[in-house]
Structure formats: C-alpha cells, structure tokens
Amino acid sequence: MTTSSSRVRRRAFLRGGGAAGLALLGIRSIGEAAAPPSGTPDDGGEPPVLGLPRLTENGAKVPIIVEMTHPMEPDHHLASVRVVNDRDPIPSKGEFHFSPANGHVYLAFQARLDDGRSAVRVGAECSRGQRWSTTREIRVAAGGGGCAGPLPVSGRGEGEIRPPVIRLPQLLRGQPIEPGQIIDVQVKLKHPTRTGLVRRGGQWVSETEPFYLTGLDVFYGSARVSRFVLTPALADDPLITFRLRPRDEGLVRVVFRNSRGAELDASHPIRFG
C-alpha cells in the first residue's frame, strides 16, 4: 500500500523524486547549492553542509538544506540542528531534534528571510556533546524580504489550512523498501504563516499576534523519531523532507501543532519488498 492517510481529502503534490523536489525549491542539486562548509568544528569531526541560494528574489520562501555525515547509533548520534540568521527580526528558523531511527541527518524546508545581505548559520550537536557550525551568506533582493506579515493575505484565512500529506519518493519511483534502508520522507502541509511584524521608520514592530506552526513530531510505530521546533520564520505551505531508517514494517506518523493549539496529523504505512 503506497497511499498516505490524513483527516482530509488528499491532493497530489510533487510528482517526482528528490531531484525534482530540489528543482521546485530553486536548487538543482545539493552540490550546486552548497559550497564546502565555511564553518569549522568546535570539538572535532566535520561540520554540517548547508545549502541555500546565494541570491533570491523571494525572501518569503527561501529553500534551506542541511545535511551531515555522522554516526546515528544509540550511544553516539547527531542529536540536534539549529538554523539561525542573527540579522533577521525572527532569528531562529527552527530547531530540529533527531534520533538514531532517522539513520542520517538530512533536512530540507523553506524559511522567511529579510532583504539585503545576511548570513545563515547552522549549529549541530551530538549526543556526546560535540558541536559543529557552518555559516553561508545570502542576499535577498531589495523589496523581496519575507519577514513582514501582520495580516493574512487575501483568501488565505484559516479556511485555507489542510492537514499534512506524507509522500515516500522511493515508492513513487517503483523501488521497494528494504529493512534498515534509509529513505526520504516528504511532508507537505497547507498552512499560512503570519509573523505579525511590520517595518516602521526602519524598525521592526510587532503589530499583531503571530499565527504559525509551532512544532512537528515524527513517530514510527509508538516511538518518537524526531521533534522539530518551528517558528514564525517558516514559509507558507511548507514542504519538509527528512530521513528515516525503518528496521521493521510499521506506520510513520507526523503531528503538527500551531500557535492556536490545533493539531494536524497524517500517517503512512511502510511495507518491505
């Protein structure tokens, strides 16, 4: 069975593999998007690879990719990744917690950035306390900043919210999943983000209460695999990609929460062979 279940009617999205998803986000490949990491490890090891465009016209939906090679075993695994832009009025772009069940640290999502030149920084920490960081510069064209948002865009009220849909690209390519294999999981959700911020006299002012997704929990069977802490810097209608290493057949489930206490969830079975 290759269809996911949710509490609303599902719509097809992104008919293609991982490369097609990157193209949709404006990045043809992780290699093109990410030069050698500019950061250096604080305690040894290799820093994360950070992929994002050098220049973008649309700061409301900037693709960000984070990948890191690190053991993912119970006694030694990459535990968390933070994405930050200290120059922005919403500095934190998210905090992402992983477990050995992820198999590999890979994360792709879309964030809001202010216009002008700035630097996006990724900090990573493993279960033994080692830390790494990588920083890359980006320029958002003048007038293209995505941090303002005091009011909902016309036609984008709460009625435009839809629960998530889970997609497993490997199954769509007709390739079976094997026990212990690391696979991509893509989650698409229709949900607007309102930062509540406006710029007046060159200063950012909070005008209204923000409305946004605050978190995402990923479960496989009864165990929580990942916990993502989200912020108003997340783009509208996000597409989030992460990895999973299923050792047994089971059900992958995602649960989003927003700033008004609502939960939106979906599930998808994983079968081998």
Predicted regions and their residues:
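N-terminal secretory signal peptides
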Residues: 1-8, 19, 23
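Aromatic sugar-binding surface patches on proteins
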Residues: 99-108, 233-241
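Extracellular Ig-like/FN3 beta-sandwich strand-entry sites
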Residues: 115-119, 247-251
